Design a protein with these regions (language model features):
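Short, linear, compositionally biased motifs with a strong N-terminal bias
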Residues: 10-11
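C-terminal motif of bacterial Sec signal peptides marking the signal peptidase cleavage site
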Residues: 14-16
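Sec-dependent signal peptide recognition
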Residues: 2-7
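Bacterial lipoprotein signal-peptidase II cleavage site
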Residues: 18-24
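Basic, polyanion-binding surface patches
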Residues: 24-225
C-alpha cells in the first residue's frame, strides 16, 4: 500500500511538471477533458466526496496542553498497514495536541452517540476546551498511550503517532479495547451490537451500518464451481 501511494505521488508530480500554461488554462482543460455521457447513468463529474461514500465516523481524542480531553470527528480514515491507520486531517486543535503528545485514541461513533459525535465535529477545542464534559461524556486515561479514552464509545484504538505531515496522520495501533456490551458469546467484537454510523456525503447525513448480508470469502464461491 505504501509503495502504491508513493508511486501515485511521483506520477502526480511528474504530470504537474510536464504541464504548460496552455494546459493549465481552465478553459483549455474543460475543452480537452470534456466528459462523455455513460449510457443509462448520470454523470457527476470528478466529485470524489461522493465516490468514497459512505465514510467512517472516527472520533479522535487527545490531551491538550492543560490535560483537558479533546475529541473531534473525522471521516477520511482507513487501514494503512497491519497495525497502522491513516487519517487525512487539516489543522485542528487535535493536530496541535498530537504534535505535542505523540499519541491519540480513535473510537467509532454509533447510533447511541450521534448527537454528541456530531457536536464534537461542530465545536473546536480552541473555543470550547471543556466540550467533552459539556456533552456529558467521561474519560479514562489510556494506560498504554498518552491520550484519553472516551468511555461512552465502546470500541477504541490506542495509537502512537508514526508520522504527521502534509495533512496525513499515520498512527500505530498499540491496543484495541472493547466494552463488554459489544462482545458476542465467544468474546469477539460484534458490529451488530456496536451499530456504528457512517457519513453519507451525498445526503449529508449519518447512516447506521446494517445487518450481515453475506460471508466474506464465501458468498461468491458459487461462481467458482
Amino acid at each position: 500500500m505504501k509503495r502504491i501511494l508513493t508511486l501515485m505521488a511521483v506520477l502526480s508530480l511528474l504530470a504537474s511538471c510536464g504541464t504548460d500554461k496552455k494546459t493549465n488554462n481552465p478553459e483549455n482543460m474543460n475543452k480537452n477533458e470534456a466528459l462523455q455521457e455513460v449510457a443509462g447513468r448520470k454523470n457527476f463529474g470528478p466529485n470524489h466526496a461522493l465516490v468514497t461514500t459512505p465514510q467512517p465516523c472516527v472520533m479522535i481524542a487527545t490531551w491538550d496542553e492543560n490535560k483537558n480531553p479533546d475529541v473531534m470527528m473525522a471521516a477520511w480514515a482507513g487501514q494503512y498497514d497491519a497495525r497502522q491507520i491513516v487519517i487525512s486531517l487539516s489543522k485542528h486543535k487535535t493536530t496541535d495536541n498530537l504534535e505535542k503528545t505523540k499519541a491519540f485514541t480513535v473510537s467509532f461513533a454509533d447510533e447511541r452517540t450521534v448527537a454528541e459525535s456530531d457536536y464534537f465535529g461542530l465545536v473546536s477545542g480552541n473555543n470550547v476546551p471543556n466540550k467533552v464534559a459539556r456533552a456529558g461524556f467521561t474519560i479514562t486515561p489510556s494506560p498504554n498511550v498518552n491520550a484519553p479514552i472516551i468511555n461512552e464509545y465502546p470500541l477504541t484504538l490506542e495509537c502512537k503517532v508514526v508520522s504527521w505531515s502534509d495533512g496525513i496522520l499515520v498512527g500505530e495501533v498499540v491496543n484495541m479495547s472493547a466494552d463488554d456490551c459489544i462482545l458476542d458469546d465467544d468474546g469477539h467484537i460484534d458490529l451488530g451490537k456496536l451499530k456504528p454510523i457512517v457519513f453519507d456525503a451525498a445526503a449529508m447525513a449519518y447512516r447506521s451500518v446494517g445487518e450481515i448480508v453475506g460471508k466474506a470469502w464465501g458468498a461468491g464461491k458459487a461462481f467458482t464451481e
